[in-house]
C-alpha cells in the first residue's frame, strides 16, 4: 500500500518474494589450506527477529552429504570427539561443542559443585532426577554455559546451552534428535539442536527424520544393513503465536503449538516441477539417491540414502491468507546424479503469490566450484560433469526489495527525523550484513544506515525510466498524528522537500480524503517498482529522498472549482460518492532541480 510517514497496514502475513540476502556472490578462498567456499542462503522469512540462522555452505574440502558432495546445512550440535579414535561411550570420551572446540568439565567448588542432581528446571518439575554436569570450551571465546543432563532412571541424555544473549538451546532431548548406535541406544554420538527459546518467549522447533528403507533396493549389498541411525533435518517451525517462557520439550515430545512459519526440507516427498507449487503435507515416501554411502567414524554404520530436493517456506495465517498453509518461497535444488558421486549443479529461487509463481531474475551466473575428486572405482573412474549455476540479485535491488516489503517504516521514520524502533533498525542492518554487531557505536550505526539507504536509492535509480506524467498520492491531513508534519501542504507556493522515499502511484484507487495530484516533467527520478514491489497491485512509483514538490493550487470541497476538478480526475463512476469522500485536491509539481 502507499506509505506516508511510515504508516501502513502491512502485517507478517503478507508474502515476501525470495532473494539471496547473503553470500552466493563468488567463490572465496581463505586460510592456509586454500579451500574454495561459498554460501547459499535459504528462503527464510524474517519473523520478529528470531528466525533460524541456516544456510547451505560449500567447501571444496567437504565430503558427501544430503546436499551432494561438498555441501552441508549444519544445525547446532554437540558430538563425541573421533580424532583420537572411535568413542568408547564412557567417561573417557571427549565432546566437541557447537563451534568445534573441545569441551572440558568445569571445576567443582564448594559454592558451585559439579555435577549436581536436578529434579526441576525453573517451574517445571521432572518425573525423574537428572545428573547435570557443567562443561565449558577448552579455549573460551563464546562465553556460553553448557550442561550435560543424564536421566537417573532411563539414562536418556541431552544438553542445555545457555547463550550469553539469554537464549536457551536444547539439544537431543528426544531420540529423534540424537544420532545413536541402533544396536545400543545409550551410545549417542551426536545431539542435534531441537528447540531454542529467547527471554521474550519466542521459540524455534527443529524436527528430524530417521533413515529407513523406503524406495531402497534391499537386495545385494543393501541387504542386512541397519540404516536407522542417520537423522535428516525435516522442518524448522518458529513464530509461536503465544509466547512461552519454558521450553515446550520439557513437557511434550511433540509440541502442540500454533506456529506461524515453517521451513520444510523436502527429500522427494513432494513434486519438484517448478510450475506446480508443492503441498505442505508430504504426498509420497522420500526418494533414494543413486550414490548411497556410509560413515563409520562413531563405531557404527550411518547410512545415507537421501538428497534434499528443495527447501520450502510456508506461512500459516488462515484468516489473512484464506488457507492454513501458504507457500511463499522455494529454493529448488537440481543435481547431476550418478552412482559414483552426486553434485549440486543449480539452485533456483521462486516466489508464490496466489495461484502463480515467479522466478527470481537472473543477474549473475557463477563458475562451477571445484568438487573434490570422486572415490576411485577401478581404472575407468571419471569425475562427473559440473553444471553449476547460481542466481542472485544485486545487493542494491535486494535492499530495494526489502524496503518495499518490510523496511519502509523504519527507513522513512529515520530519514524524516521521527521516532523509530532503533532495535529493529539494528536487527535489519545486522541481518543484511550492513553491521557486524548488534551493539554498534553511534557512528557505526549512522554509517551503516547511510550505506543501506544509498543502496536502496541506487537500486531505485537502476530501474527503467517511465513515461508517466501524472501520479497520485493519498493523504489524510486531518489525522492528528500527522497534522504537524503535513501543515506545509496547506499553503500555495510552498516548496516541500520530502526527506524520505516518497511513494506514489498512477493508479487513482489508492487515495484518501486528500488527493495529491502530482505532475511530472521529463527527467524526473521516480521509478515504477514493478516486479521489485512487494505490494504488486499498487503500481507503486517511488521517488528518492529529498524530492522537491511545489504546491501550485489547493482546491477544497465546496469551492467553485472543486466539482470541475473532481470530475476531471474521473475517480469512479459514482460522482456523489467521490464528492462525499474527497475533501481537497492539492495540485503539485515535482521539481527536477
Curated annotation (Swiss-Prot):
Its EC number is 2.4.2.31. It is found in: Secreted. Residues 361-384 are annotated as: Disordered. The keyword Glycosyltransferase applies. The active site is at residues 473, 503, 540. Residues 366-376 have a biased composition (Pro residues). Keywords: Glycosyltransferase, NAD, NADP, Nucleotide-binding, Nucleotidyltransferase, Plasmid, Secreted, Toxin, Transferase, Virulence. Pfam families: ADPrib_exo_Tox, SpvB. Mono-ADP-ribosylates muscle and non-muscle actin. ADP-ribosylates Chinese hamster ovary and HeLa cell actin as well as rabbit muscle, porcine heart actin and non-muscle beta- and gamma-actin. ADP-ribosylation of actin prevents the polymerization of G actin to F actin, causing actin filament depolymerization, destruction of the cytoskeleton and cytotoxicity; this requires only the C-terminal 120 residues. Does not possess NAD(+)-glycohydrolase activity, unlike most mART enzymes. In Salmonella spp. the spv gene cluster is encoded on a highly transmissible plasmid. This is Mono(ADP-ribosyl)transferase SpvB. It comes from Salmonella dublin.
Amino acid at each position: 500500500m502507499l506509505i506516508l510517514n511510515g504508516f501502513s497496514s502491512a502485517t507478517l502475513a503478507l508474502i515476501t518474494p525470495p532473494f539471496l540476502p547473503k553470500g552466493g556472490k563468488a567463490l572465496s578462498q581463505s586460510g592456509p589450506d586454500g579451500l574454495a567456499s561459498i554460501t547459499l542462503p535459504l528462503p527464510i522469512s524474517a519473523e520478529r527477529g528470531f528466525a533460524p540462522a541456516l544456510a547451505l555452505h560449500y567447501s571444496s574440502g567437504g565430503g558427501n552429504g544430503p546436499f551432494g558432495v561438498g555441501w552441508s546445512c549444519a544445525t547446532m550440535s554437540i558430538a563425541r570427539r573421533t580424532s583420537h579414535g572411535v568413542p568408547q561411550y564412557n567417561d573417557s570420551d571427549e565432546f566437541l561443542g557447537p563451534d568445534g572446540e573441545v569441551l572440558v568439565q568445569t571445576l567443582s567448588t564448594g559454592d558451585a559443585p559439579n555435577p549436581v542432581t536436578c529434579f526441576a528446571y525453573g517451574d517445571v518439575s521432572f518425573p525423574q532426577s537428572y545428573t547435570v554436569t557443567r562443561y565449558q570450551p577448552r579455549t573460551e571465546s563464546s562465553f556460553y554455559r553448557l550442561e550435560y543432563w543424564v536421566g537417573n532412571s532411563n539414562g536418556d541424555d541431552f544438553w542445555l546451552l545457555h547463550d550469553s544473549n539469554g537464549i536457551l538451546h536444547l539439544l537431543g532431548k528426544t531420540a529423534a534428535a540424537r544420532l545413536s548406535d541402533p544396536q545400543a541406544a545409550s551410545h549417542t554420538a551426536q545431539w542435534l539442536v531441537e528447540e531454542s527459546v529467547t527471554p521474550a518467549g519466542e521459540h524455534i522447533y527443529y524436527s528430524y527424520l530417521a533413515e529407513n528403507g523406503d524406495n531402497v533396493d534391499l537386495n545385494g549389498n543393501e541387504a542386512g544393513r541397519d540404516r536407522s541411525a542417520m537423522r535428516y533435518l525435516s522442518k524448522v517451525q518458529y513464530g509461536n503465536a503465544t509466547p512461552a517462557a519454558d521450553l515446550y520439550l520439557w513437557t511434550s515430545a511433540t509440541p502442540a503449538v500454533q506456529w506461524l512459519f515453517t521451513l520444510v526440507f523436502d527429500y522427494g516427498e513432494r513434486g519438484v516441477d517448478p510450475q506446480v507449487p508443492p503441498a505442505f503435507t508430504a504426498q509420497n515416501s522420500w526418494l533414494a539417491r543413486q550414490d548411497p554411502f556410509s560413515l563409520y567414524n562413531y563405531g557404527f554404520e550411518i547410512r545415507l540414502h537421501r538428497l534434499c530436493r528443495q527447501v520450502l517456506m510456508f506461512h500459516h495465517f488462515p484468516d489473512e491468507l484464506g488457507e492454513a498453509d501458504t507457500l511463499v518461497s522455494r529454493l529448488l535444488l537440481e543435481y547431476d546424479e550418478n552412482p559414483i558421486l552426486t553434485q549440486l549443479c543449480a539452485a533456483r529461487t521462486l516466489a508464490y503469490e496466489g495461484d502463480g509463481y515467479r522466478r527470481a531474475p537472473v543477474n549473475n551466473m557463477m563458475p562451477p566450484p571445484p568438487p573434490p575428486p570422486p572415490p576411485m572405482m577401478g581404472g575407468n573412474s571419471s569425475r562427473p560433469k559440473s553444471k553449476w549455476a547460481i542466481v542472485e540479485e544485486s545487493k542494491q535491488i535486494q535492499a530495494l526489495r526489502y524496503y518495499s516489503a518490510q523496511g519502509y517504516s523504519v527507513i522513512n521514520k529515520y530519514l524524516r527525523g521521527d521516532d523509530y524502533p532503533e532495535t529493529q533498525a539494528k536487527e535489519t542492518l545486522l541481518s543484511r550484513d550492513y553491521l557486524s554487531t548488534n551493539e554498534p557505536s553511534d557512528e557505526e550505526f549512522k554509517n551503516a544506515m547511510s550505506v543501506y539507504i544509498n543502496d536502496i536509492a541506487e537500486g531505485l535509480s537502476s530501474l527503467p525510466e517511465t513515461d508517466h506524467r501524472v501520479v497520485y498520492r493519498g493523504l489524510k491531513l486531518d489525522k492528528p498524528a500527522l497534522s504537524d508534519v503535513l501543515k506545509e501542504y496547506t499553503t500555495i507556493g510552498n516548496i516541500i522537500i520530502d526527506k524520505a522515499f516518497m511513494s506514489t502511484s498512477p493508479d487513482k484507487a489508492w487515495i484518501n480524503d486528500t488527493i495529491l495530484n502530482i505532475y511530472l516533467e521529463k527527467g524526473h527520478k521516480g521509478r515504477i517498482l514493478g516486479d521489485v514491489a512487494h505490494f504488486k497491485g499498487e503500481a507503486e512509483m517511488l521517488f528518492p529522498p529529498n524530492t522537491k514538490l511545489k504546491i501550485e493550487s489547493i482546491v477544497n470541497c465546496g469551492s467553485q472549482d472543486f466539482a470541475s476538478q473532481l470530475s476531471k480526475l474521473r475517480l469512479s463512476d459514482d460522482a456523489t460518492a467521490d464528492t462525499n469522500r474527497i475533501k481537497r485536491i492539492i495540485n503539485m509539481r515535482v521539481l527536477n532541480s
